Amino acid sequence: MLMTGSVGDGSEFDWEDQKTFISRDGGLTWRFVHNSSGLYATGDLGNIIVYIPYDPEEDGDFQSEFYYSLDQGRTWNEYELTNAISSVHPYKLINPTPDGSGSKFIFKGTFATTDSETNSITSLKGVEYIIDFSAAFDSRTCEEEDFEDWDLADGKCVNGAKYKYRRRKQDAQCLVKKAFKDLSLDETPCNSCGESDYECSFEFVRDANGLCIPDYNLIAFSNICDKSKDKSVLVEPLQLIKGDECKTPMKIEPVDIPCDEIPEEGSSDREIVTTENKFDFEIKFYQYFDTVADESLVMLNSIGDAYISHDGGQTIKRFDTNGEKIVEVVFNPYFNSSAYLFGSKGNIFSTHDRGHSFMIAKLPEARQLGMPLDFSAKAQDTFIYYGGKNCESILSPECHAVAYLTKDGGETFTEMLDNAIHCEFAGTLFEYPSNEEMVMCQVKKKSSETRSLVSSIDFFQGDNKIIFENIIGYLSTGGYIIVAVPHEDNELRAYVTIDGTEFAEAKFPYGQDVSKQEAFTILGSEKGSIFLHLATNLESGHDFGNLLKSNSNGTSFVTLEHAVNRNTFGYVDFEKVQGLEGIIITNIVSNREKVGENKEDEQLKTKITFNDGSDWNFLKPPKKDSEGKKFPCDSVSLDKCSLHLHGYTERKDIRDTYSSGSALGMMFGVGNVGDKLLPYEECSTFLTTDGGETWTEVKKGPHQWEYGDHGGVLVLVPENAETDSISYSTDFGKTWKDYKFCGDKVLVKDIITVPRDSALRFLLFGEAKNMGSGSFRTYTIDFRNIFERQCEFDITGKKRADFKYSPLGSRTGCLFGHQTEFLRKTDEKCFIGNIPLSEFSRNVKNCSCTRQDFECDYNFYKASDGTCKLVKGLSSANGADICKKEPDLIEYYDSSGYRKIPLSTCKGGLKLDAHLAPHPCPGKEKAFREKYSINTGAYALVFVTILLVIFFAAWFVYDRGIRRNGGFSRFEEIRLGDDGLIENNRTDRVVNIIVRLGLCISLITKSAFQRTKAGVARFSSKLRARFGNRKGPTYSSLLQGQFSDESDGLHEDANDLSSFTSQDSNFEIEQEDAYRPEQEHTSQIDQPATSNIPDALPARSAIHKPDSTAVRNEDE
């Protein structure tokens, strides 16, 4: 067999990496043939093999060649086509003998003719060769002694028999020269049957130890109990593989299956199948491979035994390590089929096919330190391992960490950097890296108390650049690397880079609650912003701080919310809803002043934002609980009565998030309705299906939850309580059913499914108290059979309407500058499967910008009236800083107080971030003046030209229409329609029309003036007659600054929204249909109104419109 392929797990394919291999034992073993791909053909029953590379220049010369072997692929010879045209590209290679027994081959290819002067291709031509091997070995024909017997599978039994085949010896110097005949295999049945000759009977499946155990779902299908009148039946768990030829069967003990444990016909839950597996030791670690190929996962128990399952835990096999215990399991975050198991004896077991196969390699001779691996985001086999060198003991003076690099998946390691404790392949993380080979490492020498940050572009073979001499630590997120650097007075500073070379200090906003930057937590990044929590109170057990958000390059932060809860370990009650833009849930400390003074314990309240942190609201509570009763609090104010949820800081497993990336809009949470968050055990379980807009209490008491089939199956199990049942819903939480999954009550510690939440199988980890051996158990609950069919996916809507596009909740308007609809299932009787619904959302339309598309800029805060005002005593960001970052700029702008939310795609409409007047960058004053200076010479020329045209036209009309007709002295004598004017041609007539028109306008103006003057005189006379007894005139003064406002300046507090409206659009804030979530503090600007100006601001009309009464008094 000759094949083209590559060595790997099959997850990647690249034609440039394809090589050619050969096997002469039916594919059992393979040998390398050539470092390229090409055409191949065989002759003389496989004794002649011809191979031609697709690229004739792969060997470095232009001469075309082919390769051949006469010893069944052991050795190869090159034959150059010396008389041929160079660079012939093959497209066909065949043995013209139909059965492949001939010794001649036909090779067809193409070559290009080029122009000798321009070296360009002028035409393509075909060429054909006949390759003849009939004279090989001096035309000697093989005899009987040139043949041998070949045993299939190295003589092992295959399907109960051994097989032999007669073929030419590999080193025989002859050709067979016989026509092909059907294979005549010498078959010898094996005497005794072995385990390899058997498979599980239909009613059984294999468990973790490879034993066949009853599957009651299959038993129900087989109807074996219906054929028996007894309460139980005996069934052999093994059956001989069909077609197996072994003679003596194994003795198989039948299994007694109780028929009363089989679900009866008509049971509502008969299609739900539960598979139980028992363990003597607790399962401490478990994780799925994040793929759609199957439901593979790795589990590790408390004594270091590893288990593999490929069907969601139904069948579990113990991983054979030859007695070596597994101390750690690490998954590759960039390549979802790869994982690494570290053995206690220094071996590393790696898989790149989700645990179907493993490769074993030896770790470097170093002590395992338990530090996580660091992987390359672009090379699957490249990662960094950290080991301890000179470590007889961790406390040894010479013991230190060493970073080891592997580029072949762990088969070989090279020592990369001493004292490195954390490295990252920075060049693979940035969108636009300065060098793709860049590696950054944090170095901690044992003799020093400080840590430094270094980088290299050759894995520290020669290049070693120190970036920071002293750091606290660093991490990467979403295309950024953030470094925490100590500062004077026990403060911290954060530096950010987006290319690995240029670092800029992150500017945090200052306020009354931020006195020092002592601790911060990076919460992640998404679409051009970093979310960060800056601690403002570090009292143990009473920690909280401000939630910040950066601009696109991560250097300028603004405050989104104050007093956001954190714990002593730096974890924060902050969670972005998966799959939906801009929805974040946080818990705030509502009594932060008294907590800061140690007078009260923390009182937490839950808030949500629908526009990426610009506006926050309390959660709307449901009207009734799961029993149909009203909640104790019914205040209209959400500040006094809202829903509160326990957050990230209290989770046992950080993977248990509120939401799911595939069940769009759905979130579970444990909480309560009231004025503050109650203790966990006093709370209930709530569900939302519209992204947090509305909530429903689904179960009393705390529950664990899991999503399946993109939210088509929802499962709840009681938390911290023994149970034998789960609750599930197949209609998105509208109704719930209970299902009993085991006979004895167990304490369920966790419920999981595949990371994409698309499977119909759920895996529960439980512990049965007082059960002795086998008290630790897993239960795989399979919902695959409860649906009638799989949903038909057709986004065109021409077929069955199992899906439709719809908005999320009531938000039918614009959000982040666009209106989005999501694809959702309409028929509850079908299941979705692996269809990636989250990838099929669509933007219905783009929208004009409104106030909701902007957030406050650096050192600005959002006031109660919805405007952004400058923090008292602070200044806006120095716009000139951008000149340092971009040396080619010649100008910069001051901040308007607003900046556009990075998620927003709006166009036109409100322009709150519009630039003010430009300023020259330092040192670019001359270029600035040249750009904006007026060209006086050009303007003077235009002005003079216009004056000359006007003067010439006036002189022409005067000369031809006035002077020639008697001059100005006759002007008053001319009447309209007078024929006394001279008109000798068309020009005279046009000039006279202009003269008459001027006369008409002059007379009308004069008459209007005289009438107005007479009317004013009469009115004045009447006033004097009526008020003549007054002592004298009175006046009313209007002071210049009477109605001015200190906040009227745009640069200082940016509070006049109307001045930003686009000149070419009539869009207004109140006229937008965009969704506006209810505000905690309602402001005029966020409500429908008839005015463009917030109530808190002075009306512009009152400033610029004169008071009619005042004017009238002044005219007296």
Swiss-Prot record:
Record's bilayer topology term:
Single-pass membrane protein
Composition bias, Basic and acidic residues:
1073-1083
Question: What is the protein named?
Answer: Uncharacterized membrane glycoprotein YNR065C
Write down the InterPro entries for this protein, in alphabetical order: Sortilin_C, Sortilin_N, VPS10, VPS10-sortilin, WD40/YVTN_repeat-like_dom_sf
Q: Cite the Gene3D superfamilies for this sequence.
A: 2.10.70.80, 3.30.60.270, YVTN repeat-like/Quinoprotein amine dehydrogenase
The UniProt transmembrane annotation reads: 934-957
Q: Where in the cell is it found?
A: Membrane
One of the Pfam families matching this protein, by short name: Sortilin-Vps10
Keyword set, alphabetical order: Glycoprotein, Membrane, Repeat, Transmembrane, Transmembrane helix
Write down the superkingdom of origin: Eukaryota
Principal location class: membrane
The entry's cellular-component GO terms read: cytosol; endoplasmic reticulum; Golgi apparatus; membrane
* Record region (Disordered): 1069-1116
Taxonomy of the source species = Eukaryota, Fungi, Dikarya, Ascomycota, Saccharomycotina
Q: Could you tell me where the Polar residues compositional bias lies?
A: 1084-1093
Each BNR repeat occupies one of these ranges, namely 21-32, 67-78, 307-318, 404-415, 607-618, 686-697, 727-738
Q: Which Gene Ontology BP annotations are present?
A: Golgi to endosome transport; Golgi to vacuole transport; protein targeting to vacuole
Residues glycosylated per entry = N35, N336, N553, N846, N985
